[in-house]
Amino acid sequence: MASPKLHDFRHIVVKVGSSLLIDSAAGEVRAGWLAALAADIAELHRGGRDVMVVSSGSIALGRSRLKLPRGPLKLEESQAAAAVGQIELARTWSEVLGAHGIGAGQILVTFQDTEERRRYLNARSTIAKLLEWRAVPVINENDTVATTEIRYGDNDRLAARVATMASADLLILLSDIDGLYTAPPGSNPDATLIPVVEAITAEIEGMAGAAGSELSRGGMRTKIEAAKIATSAGTHMLIASGKIDHPLKAIADGGKCTWFLTPANPVTARKRWIAGTLEPKGTLTIDAGAVSALRAGKSLLPAGVIRVDGQFSRGDAVIVRGPDTHEIGRGLVAYDAEDAEKIKGHSSPDVMMILGITGRAEMIHRDDLVVGTAPT
């Protein structure tokens, strides 16, 4: 199968590791390289694409600023170093993107933010709003509060979760190697690059090494794990070298890389997950006008809801039924059951007056809604 082209994609997540971003000897950001990457991002941005960045580097920058000795850090030392480094990292990205007239928004996430549905929806909504405002979200694991037991441990898998959360159609992992090889290229002269992976088989997994460095916790094995997460959610992924200047331009020009392809797309994969995987926690019964609106691709507004049943929290899956009780679809609800009961039948502008807060305009956003027959 032929490799796709970078400009075929509209919603792109770019992951940048510590070993690329930070000069390990000097403990400083590789300013020239980052400026070149920012220029690449700006070019995609000018083309109307949504670009999100998952950036490592907070711990590495923090330990440099604090003049900590080389070697492994204890958990509390890593957390404290990250607290210092996160400020430096945010400032750095703001400056390099600002040079192109692009705003940067920092988002610090934890493992729970992508696994617990209420927090998942909050993070997803924040990313969506930044993209709507044509800013570039810069995302990192919140190493200041993450624990050894509950964390991603590497930003490859975090990037895959972010790509899934944001319904990205492409995840780019910039690495110190230009793709997946049949064997470790540093020690095997017969190793060859695999340009396209259509399915992640046991053989493909066996090709993944465990290489890493003091600054970068990830190796090829974690990249394969990231590819599993991304492709199962309908997101294509590629691994390419970030050691060169203008790495995204190199990809666009057909440079060496490995593509991990998926036959699905993010929207269908996400809606399949909502319709067939999540257990519904309640039911919303809607009027005939709302039924017509949903079938026309609209979101479900509070005004169209006539009955609320069940005990559910924001982010839970619920069944949507028409006035004849037939199932219309399923979706992730933006309000818990108590608040949904209060605002049912009311127009969206009334929500603030009723709840005392500025809530979502939609009871279920169309991106979180599957309209059709009940799954079998």
Curated annotation (Swiss-Prot):
Binding site for substrate: 56, 143, 155
Database matches in Gene3D superfamilies: Acetylglutamate kinase-like, PUA domain
Locations listed in the record: Cytoplasm
Top-level EC class: transferase
Catalytic activity: L-glutamate + ATP = L-glutamyl 5-phosphate + ADP
Annotated metabolic or biological route of this protein: Amino-acid biosynthesis; L-proline biosynthesis; L-glutamate 5-semialdehyde from L-glutamate: step 1/2
Cellular component GO terms held in the UniProt record: cytosol
Predominant location category: cytoplasm
Domain PUA residue range list: 281-358
The entry's keywords: Amino-acid biosynthesis, ATP-binding, Cytoplasm, Kinase, Nucleotide-binding, Proline biosynthesis, Transferase
Binding site for ATP: 15, 175-176
Record Pfam families: AA_kinase (PF00696), PUA (PF01472)
Family: Belongs to the glutamate 5-kinase family.
The protein's name in its UniProt record: Glutamate 5-kinase
Upper taxonomic lineage: Bacteria, Pseudomonadati, Pseudomonadota, Alphaproteobacteria, Hyphomicrobiales
